[in-house]
């Protein structure tokens, strides 16, 4: 349990839970981006490649959660959370650049590894940092941030689509949709 003032504790809880926001954003944003990715990369809707772009995050998440659990007791949750933030950042940038199928899938697998790591690390990390009488509320912060991330993904999908608020070209908007996740990833690293 932390022995700092409440502002410092809240700061740590918020930044720790940013991994949940990234989890939600990275799993939700693909629904809007796929409408335009297929056109630019010439991938047929409903094809194996189309489905694999979406599923690659989940495959990475399985790997990330399986690997990070045993490592967290040896290396510490904070170090691994910072490592996950770096992986989130690299994966988001790679997805945003995504000029070909291989780069996009590889970047999304990296994002999945970070999602799996965050899922295994953050709830325990927040529980260890919080006082017993506030542990339940602070523990739900991770889940709240996942839902907030999904909501923000749908907002960005709307705003960055050709018919959306910013009206970006379909070959530009999806890159921004996926790449924007680098911002909270950088904040997670800085705040961690």
Language model region names:
Residues 1-192:
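Transmembrane-helix signature of 12-pass secondary carriers
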